[in-house]
Amino acid sequence: MIQGQIVTLIPATLADRQDVYEWCFHSDITKCHAGPPDYPNAPIAPPDEFFGEYGYQDYYFTGEKPTQGMGFLILHQGEAVGFVSYSCFHLQPGMAELDIWMRCEAHCGKGYGSDALLALGEWLRKTLNIRTLMMRPSIRNARANRTYQKVGFVQSDQSPDAFLLAEYVEALGDGDYGAAESALLIKTLSNNTAS
């Protein structure tokens, strides 16, 4: 369990997989990050792709490969309000890529996501010695980009290739939205705090 200021992160389990998928691709906020008409380069992923080779494999829900990645439910007052994860398998040492989405629109704009990102970043710094966090949202998702910047992420003008292991550049270098549509946001964690 990871405690934030207003949310608690608990490891997601295999029993949570379907809910996590539904929150991402079949909720009232899906339109903010995936599928036509606004995101034609990021179609709604079918479950086999979402849980596939470069997606949320079982270890994100079992915790058995924490150096590669792991997922957490975001709880507020005991209620699941979203999902946050980190992935390291494809990145240079000392780095983690974060991803986050809320369960529904009613849980957006309340600080839950910001608090979850700060808490997870601090945990990664202390637990896995992660020093650099990365996020790759769509450049068109203004609300998400503002949230990420509010918690310390900054737009990088480096190529994503500089952060990826060579064997993943071709498959993952363009991000979920394609090279022209994917932002590259970076946050460097200090020795004292992730915030």
Describe the role of every protein-language-model region.
Residues K126-R136:
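Conserved GNAT acetyl-CoA-binding A-motif
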Residues C104-A106, K110, I139-R140:
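Active-site acidic-Proline motif in GNAT/NAT acetyltransferases
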Residues M135-N145, D161-A166:
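Conserved beta-strand-loop-alpha-helix junction that forms the acyl-donor binding cleft
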Residues Q149-S159:
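Conserved acetyl-CoA-binding loop of GNAT-fold acetyltransferases
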Residues P40-H107, T188-S190:
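Acetyl-CoA-dependent GNAT
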Residues M1-F50, N191-S195:
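A short, well-structured alpha-helix characteristic of acyl/acetyltransferase catalytic modules
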Residues G109-W123, R146-K150:
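Conserved acetyl-CoA-binding loop-helix of GNAT-fold acetyltransferases
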Residues M1, A166-S195:
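Terminal substrate-recognition subdomain of acyl/acetyltransferases
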